[in-house]
């Protein structure tokens, strides 16, 4: 879940910078100089949309380390770190890709995998998770994160976000142009966008961006089921993953990081639309019914 939230926040920041830069450089004035050029607008939206998502992907590992204070284990200094590194090595080898970086950080029970590719990935585990589960359960969580990497979930998320970014920019500019044209009623023939265009485009980008995040979270929840199934396959047994999920469910909400509580682990209702993970009971049921 931390992986998805960090990606979305980074994507928002990058898109904001690119959008403001485009406005300063006069791209919007060019697009509306002789009426709205739909073809050029679509190209512009795709360049900014996919550019923003791929920049976010490239920054994902660095941002994850910075935001959590995760320390990569280069030389294990304890038996716990030796076990952690060797477990990730064994699981990644079984999955068929080079061992990712392994990091540990102080915090509530959590773990995540991130990185732009299998060969440049990171698996990070919190001390809270290591101390609240037995080793078999921790191994199942690690297998889950390794499965995320093996399934290419970060790249999939990037492509989905790129498409959504494109539509957010494209539709917001069209609506902004229509609003601006209505407000000005041809009183300004210069073709330069007015204040109505800027306000409307920013408002629409925020609104459509929120709606787009719901779509991203929907796909994220689907990928979680695949990662659970992948963990069961890597472990050769679905029981450890089920036990790990139940262990998470037995923790008090106050022991969980905020993003876990917002992911359906300790909440529901409308917020479920913005959850990166399905409810624990649904994940457990899916594992128990798998053949």
From Swiss-Prot:
Binds 1 zinc ion per subunit. Keywords: Cell inner membrane, Cell membrane, Hydrolase, Membrane, Metal-binding, Metalloprotease, Protease, Transmembrane, Transmembrane helix, Zinc. It is found in: Cell inner membrane. It holds the Pfam family Peptidase_M48. The active site is at residue 145. The chain crosses the membrane at residues 4-24, 38-58, 159-179, 199-219. It is a multi-pass membrane protein. GO terms for cellular component: plasma membrane. InterPro entries: HtpX_protease, Pept_M48_protease_HtpX, Peptidase_M48. It is an enzyme of class 3 (hydrolase). Its cofactor is Zn(2+). Its EC number is 3.4.24.-. Zn(2+) binds at residues 144, 148, 224. HAMAP family: Pept_M48_protease_HtpX (MF_00188). Belongs to the peptidase M48B family. This is Protease HtpX homolog. It comes from Pelodictyon phaeoclathratiforme (strain DSM 5477 / BU-1).
